Amino acid sequence: MRQDGRKQNQLREVEIIPHFTKHAEGSVLISVGDTKVICTASIENRVPPFLRGQNKGWLAAEYSMLPRATGQRTIREAAKGKLSGRTMEIQRLIGRALRAVVDLEKLGEKTIWIDCDVIQADGGTRTASITGAYVALVLAVQKAFAEKTISAWPITDFLAAISVGILPEEGAVCDLCYSEDSQAKVDMNIVQTGSGDFVEVQGSGEEAVYTRSELNELLDLAAEGIDQLIHIQRPFLGEAASWIEEKKGT
């Protein structure tokens, strides 16, 4: 039994509040246990210089944490004048993950900006960001599609992310909170599509090694958890869920 009483394969409580902000084309507040992230998707009618004239779009992501999202206040990175390596790694991960399920050529010369702002952190902020940002992305694209500013549906599959790990006593578990993550022997972040294909597998041992069979067990736990997360996402996608289902795996 885990510290909070969950089973090995049990997610924390997940809540998604759509249209959480007024101005963004798509937005959600996602809560995964005590981790809370505001995710917005904004559409701009321009692309980076390297894509100009190619009639192809782009998707990029930014990630940040409020100073008191954690137990001790941290200095804003804007005040430091530079992003930390962790922040750069996470926002690149979010961008890569979402681009994997977007046909960029169908965006035209548009950029979709994903912003993930952690307002409270208790482990799994990057995976919660991806899961929430996907819903915000679909809401934004659905709005643009209805307004005919995007002429062809570009999102090709469902997407979610989860953490898994190996704890000293409990063994393999999914969706680690901070106290579990801080003592995990092995920690992984998995991003997977609704078709079951992997987008990203980030994993490492902490003064420990793990076997191929343990890796397989972690991947199976992640796949089960991601299926549950996609099931939670779907009601918020509206009619777009059926369009994505048609395109899934194509």
Curated annotation (Swiss-Prot):
Keywords of this entry: Nucleotidyltransferase, RNA-binding, rRNA processing, Transferase, tRNA processing, tRNA-binding
E.C. designation(s): 2.7.7.56
CDD domains the record matches: RNase_PH_bact (cd11362)
Gene3D superfamilies (UniProt xref): GHMP Kinase, N-terminal domain
Catalytic activity: tRNA(n+1) + phosphate = tRNA(n) + a ribonucleoside 5'-diphosphate
Sequence positions that bind phosphate: 86, 124-126
EC top class, as a word: transferase
GO biological process, one term: rRNA catabolic process
One GO MF term attached to the UniProt entry: tRNA binding
Annotated family: Belongs to the RNase PH family.
Oligomeric form and interacting partners: Homohexameric ring arranged as a trimer of dimers.
Cited function: Phosphorolytic 3'-5' exoribonuclease that plays an important role in tRNA 3'-end maturation. Removes nucleotide residues following the 3'-CCA terminus of tRNAs; can also add nucleotides to the ends of RNA molecules by using nucleoside diphosphates as substrates, but this may not be physiologically important. Probably plays a role in initiation of 16S rRNA degradation (leading to ribosome degradation) during starvation.
PANTHER family associated with the record: EXOSOME COMPLEX COMPONENT (PTHR11953), EXOSOME COMPLEX COMPONENT RRP41 (PTHR11953:SF0)
Name this protein carries in UniProt: Ribonuclease PH
Organism of origin: Shouchella clausii (strain KSM-K16) (Alkalihalobacillus clausii)
GN (gene name): rph
